[in-house]
Amino acid sequence: MTTTTNIINNGVSSFSLNNNSNIPTIHSPSNPIVDCIRDGTMAYIYLVDESYIQQQHQPNPKFPSLIPLPKKLYSTTPNKTTPYPFQFQQNNENLSIVKEIYNYINCFEIKDCRDFHCVDSIKRYARFHLNLTLKFMGCKSIHARQISNTVFEQLEKCRIEQNKQLTATNNNAIVTTDSITKTEQSTTTTTTTTTTTTTTTATTTTQPPIYCVSIQRNIFYYIIGHILSCYQYSKPQYIIDFPVSCEVQDKKHSFTILLGGTSGCGKSTLTALLASRIGFTAVISTDNIRQLLRKFISRQESPILWASTYHAGEIISNPSLSHKEKILQGYEAQNEMIFNKLDILIGHYEKRKESLIVEGVHLDTKLILRLVKKHPSCIPFLMYISNEAKHKERFAIRSKYMTLDPHQNKYTKYFKNIRIINDHLCHGADEHMIPQIDNTSIDRSLATIHGTIFACLKRKVQCGESYYNHETDKMNMLYNQYEQIQHQFWSSKGMLRLIQKKKTVSPHGNNNVTGDVDNNNSNSNNNNVNNNNGDNNGDSNVDNNSNDNDNNNNNSNNISNINNDNDNNNNDNDNSNVDNNNDNSDNSVNSNNSINSNNGNEGSNNCNVVNGNNSNSDILIKVEYNKNNNSSSNDNEYKNSNDNHCNIKNETENSDINGCINNNIISYNNNIKNNTDNTTGNHNYTTMNGNNENDCKNNNNNNNIKTIPNEGQQQPQQQPQQQPPQQSQQQPQLQQKKQQIQEEQQNLNNNNKSIEDDEEAFNSDDEHDHEDDSIRGNESGSVGDHGNSVKKSSLNDKNHNNGNNQSNEDNDDDSDISDSDSDGGERIDYYLDCGSLGS
C-alpha cells in the first residue's frame, strides 16, 4: 500500500511503471493503477450523453468541446424503439469487422482531453471501474474481469483499424510529381537522414501515448449487451440491469445498507464480503461510533455508554422492572446515544451521492424506522441465528481462550441476554416487514442481500417507488422484492426434493402379465413372479440386486419359483410391484403375494393391515438383518391409497439368509407349518419368527402353486382365465399342492444347518469392512403422478444391539459439527436407490 501511495505522490509516469525493473510487483494484471493506465493501448472510455453531443453539433456551440466527439449521433425517440444503426454478428465479439461502428466512436490521445469533471454529461471509465459496474449488476468476478478486458481490447482493435484506414487515405492523397530535380532529391535525402536520427533519439526518451475513446452512452450500452451475450449473459434482464449499475457508478443514485442483529450473528463478516462483492468500500460500524463517543464522554458521565449492549440493563436500578425489561431498556438507551451521530453521517453520504454500508447491534427496529423515514436511500436487513446451539458455538471463536466456559467467555455468560435482544429484534422486524435473514449460510445470505438491493434499486430508478410505505408504516416494496429473491436461491433440501422427483418413476398399470428381473450378480437367484387374479391381470416387477456376495452358491438358489394363481372376484389389487434388493449377501427370496379385501369389511391377514372403504393399498415390507444380534427385524407398513396399485418392497441387507415371503408372511430360517382345511379349500399359513407368530388366512381363496422354469428356459405362455372349478374337483389339486409344499419345507430344513454355520462365520468377520454399508440416512419422497408413495425405513445401526430403526429429522439449520458459514449451510447425506426408484 505504501508503494502505491509513493508512486501516486511522486508522480511516477506510466512509462516508468512498465519499464522500471526496480518495481517488479507493481506491473501485474491485478494492480488497479496498471489497469487504468496502460501505455500504447486503450486506457479510458469516455461516455458522452446524447444531449451534450447535440449541443456540440450545433453551428455555434456556447462552449468548446472538452473531448473529441464521434462523427455521428444516434438519436433515440421517447418510446425507445429506434433501431440501432448497425448490427453485430451473433456470438462474435470482434467489433472491428463492423464498419459502421467507426462513425460512432472517436479515438484520441489523452493529451487532447481537457478537464471534464465539471460536466456531468461526460463520465470516464477505466478497466477497474467497468469491472466494479459488472460485479454490482450480478456478474461473477471472473466474468466481470474478462468482459471488461474484452471491451477494451475490442475498442483497441477498432482504433488500430481506424488508423490503418487513415494511413491508406493519406497515402492515396499524396501526389508525386516528376518535376523534382535530382539536386533537390539529394538535399532532401541528407536532411531526412539527420531528422530521422533526431526523431529516433526523441522516441527513446518520450513516453508512449495513452489512447482514449469517446462514445455515446446508448451505443456503449449496446456494445456491452453484445459482449455480455457472448459470455452467456444473454437474458434481457442483464441488458436492463447494466444501465442501472452505471448510474450508481456515476453517482446519480446512491443507497445506504443497514445490517442489524445481535452479537455473533455474522454482521461484520457479511458486511466485508458484501462491500467487496458490490465494489463499495465505505463501511462503518456502530461499535466504532460508540468507541469515538467514549473518547469524549467519561464513564462517570454516561455509564450506559461504557457498557456492552447485552448487560447495559444492569446499570438500571429500577426494582419494578423485570430482568427482560431491564435488558431491553438498557439496550435502547445506548442506541439513542448512537442515533444522532449516525444520522449525521448518513446525511453527508446522501448529499455526495455515495453509497454506504452500516452494520451493528445498535440498529434496532425503532432506530431503523427513524432512519428510513428521514433518509429514503436506506435499505435495512436483520441478521439472526435461529438455532441457539449454533449461535452459542460461534462465541467460542470470539473468546480469548477458545472456550464456551462462562467464566472465561463473556458472551457465553450473557448468552441469555443476547437471545432476549434477538427475539426483540425479530418481533419488531415482523411487525414492520423488515427482511430477516437466517445467517446459517454465508453464501446464500450474501446472494440474497445483493439480489434484493439491486432489485429494489432498479424499481426505484425505473418506477420511482419508495422502499418505505408511510401509510402502512411497513417496508412493503422491500419485503416483496426480498421474497422474490429468496425463492430464487434454493436450499439444499429443496434441491434434494427436486432430484428425488426427477429420479423416481411411478409404476403404471397394464392389462397384461409381465415379469421383469434385473440381476446384477452371477450368484443371485433368478426370480420370476407371475400373478393371475380372477378378475384382472396385474403387473409384477421384480428387481433383484445382489452385490458383494461373500459366500458360495450352496447358500442360495435352493428355492424354486412359485406361480400364484388367485381366483377371487373380490380381489381389486391389479398391480403388484415387488422390489428385492440384496446387498452384501447371497439370498433367495420367493414372493407369493395374494391380498384379499372384502370391500373393507375384513382384511386378508392380521399383520397390522389397515383396510378402508377402498380395496387398494400400498404395502412396504422391509426385511433388515442385525449383524450383532443374528436376528431379523420385520417392519411392515401399510397405507391406503385411491389407485389400483399395490407396491410391495422387500429389502434385505447385510445378511446371508434364505427368506420366503408367502401371503405377506416373512419366513426367516424357520420351518413353515402348513395346515390345510379340506372342507373349505382354504390354506392357513403359520410362520414362526423368533418369539413372534403371524397367522394369515385367505377366505374363499384358492391358491394354485406351480413351478416356473428358471431364467434362460422358455417360460410358458399365459393361459386364458377360466372360471374357478367346483370344490369337489379341487381336492386332488389341494393334495398335490400340500405335497409340493412339504417337499419345499424339507429342502429348507436340510439347508438350515448349513445356513446357520455360514451365519456364524459371517458374524465373526470384521465389522469395519461393512461399516459404510450399514449406516445410511433416512429418506422420503413422493413417487410418480398416480399418488403412490414409497416409504423407506432406515437401516439398523451395527453399533447398537436393538432392532429399532433410526431416523434423521431434517432441520433448517446445520446439524453437523462443521462451521455453519460453509457453502450451502446444510449437510445432507443423500442416497438414491436406483433399483427401487427406477432409472
UniProtKB/Swiss-Prot annotation:
Coiled coil: 726-764
Keyword field: Coiled coil
Biased amino acid composition, Low complexity: 509-611, 689-704, 713-753
Basic and acidic residues composition bias: residue spans: 636-646, 765-776
Acidic residues bias locations: 809-823
Spans annotated as Disordered: 504-611, 627-646, 682-839
Cited InterPro entries: P-loop_NTPase (IPR027417)
Protein name per its UniProtKB record: Uncharacterized protein DDB_G0273453/DDB_G0273565
Biological source species: Dictyostelium discoideum
